[in-house]
Amino acid sequence: MTRTILILLIGFLSSIVAGCSDTNLTHDIPLVPRPAQIVPGSGNYLFSGKTVFAVENEEQAEVARSFIALFTRAAGFTPKLTVGDAEKGNVRFQTDATLKSEAYTLQVSPKEIIIEASDAKGFFYALQTIRQLLPASIEKEEVSDKKVKWSIPAVSIQDEPRFGYRALLLDASRFFIPKENVL
């Protein structure tokens, strides 16, 4: 009797342990919404005052400036921005007309970051992904502690929207909101 219970207990515990082992490493990179494809790399890219954002045109520059402002405010340094020559930077914006609207490809290595998108929305969403990968101190309104490492993990990400629209759900059964407030 005790032998049967012991065998059942060992079988039960081993099935629990086997079910808990997950070789998928993508859960180590917390991103919302989950990108279509994530391939972790090795190492980290470190942002600093020497980081250069290289963009192809003024539309991309506008997107980059809003992201650079986060570093100015929270990190106390301002990465540089060059417009017109996307090959002369550590963070490079490259237009890829084959990608869908709002889609992007993000390749992060210890030496550089390459962002490919077909439009400004794609570059914006790629930078929002980078923003999530940065330490939470990037959201502060004042300069953070000097010990913060402004780095992101090396990773390759491909993403595109699953749907052609963005939506907002108003749960009118719980909160009665006047029409004027919604609009």
Where are these regions (language model features)?
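Positively charged n-region of N-terminal signal peptides that target proteins for export
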Residues: 1-5
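Bacterial N-terminal signal peptides
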Residues: 7-16
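Acidic, contiguous N-terminal accessory segments
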Residues: 20-163
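Hydrophobic faces of well-ordered beta-strands that scaffold small-molecule active sites
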Residues: 166-170
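A conserved hydrophobic secondary-structure block that centers on an alpha-helix together
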Residues: 171-183
